[in-house]
């Protein structure tokens, strides 16, 4: 009974801390010219291009300002990279399957909102629909289901075979998400390939 109570309390704490919202709309959508702009942006210690465009690969540590940003194509937090997103930040993703934030193995995402100032990932359009953009994908090093007895199996993401996930580090840590809303994610490239991230 004590173990059941501890498991329940652990689950309740996680559910309270992680506020993921799947948003949907009955609208047919309108991309307003916000198509996927590619990934020609920053690399290294900054993924911010200009005033508010997020693009490229982060290999160092970066803290965003609490304001609105546009996610332009694929943004990757590479091994050794760390992205800190403060409370009250909104990130609007451009439309498309290639528009997503991926935390590679060894990368870290700290998105710590509050009840009054959540962090919002959403579509960059006035007429959003479910599946408008990819979402947030975290590729950790923890064992994956159905893995070998030694729990060392890894797999490759369907969306980009350059990035593996899984392994044998049961205590792996890819960061923290608290009071985060992720809306209109889950884009598909075909009937069989879609984003299944957060």
PLM features: residue spans?
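Beta-strand/loop edge motif enriched in small/polar residues
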Residues: 24-198
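Bacterial N-terminal signal peptides that target proteins for export
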Residues: 1-10
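C-terminal motif of bacterial Sec signal peptides marking the signal peptidase cleavage site
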Residues: 18-22
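Generic detector of short alpha-helix boundary/capping microenvironments
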Residues: 10-11, 168
């Amino acid at each position: 009974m004590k173990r059941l109570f501890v498991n329940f309390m652990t689950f309740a704490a996680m559910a309270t801390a992680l506020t993921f919202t799947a948003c949907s709309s009955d609208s047919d959508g309108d991309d307003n010219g916000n198509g996927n702009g590619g990934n020609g942006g920053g690399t290294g210690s900054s993924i911010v291009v200009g005033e508010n465009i997020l693009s490229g690969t982060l290999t160092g540590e970066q803290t965003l300002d609490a304001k609105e940003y546009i996610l332009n194509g694929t943004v990757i937090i590479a091994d050794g990279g760390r992205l800190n997103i403060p409370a009250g930040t909104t990130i609007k993703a451009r439309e498309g399957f290639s528009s997503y934030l991926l935390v590679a193995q060894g990368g870290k995402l700290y998105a710590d909102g509050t009840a009054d100032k959540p962090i919002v990932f959403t579509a960059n359009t006035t007429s959003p629909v479910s599946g408008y953009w990819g979402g947030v994908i975290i590729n950790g090093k923890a064992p994956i289901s159905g893995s070998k007895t030694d729990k060392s199996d890894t797999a490759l993401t369907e969306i980009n075979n350059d990035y593996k996930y899984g392994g044998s580090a049961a205590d792996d840590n890819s960061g923290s998400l608290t009071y985060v809303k992720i809306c209109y994610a889950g884009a598909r490239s075909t009937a069989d390939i879609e984003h299944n991230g957060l």
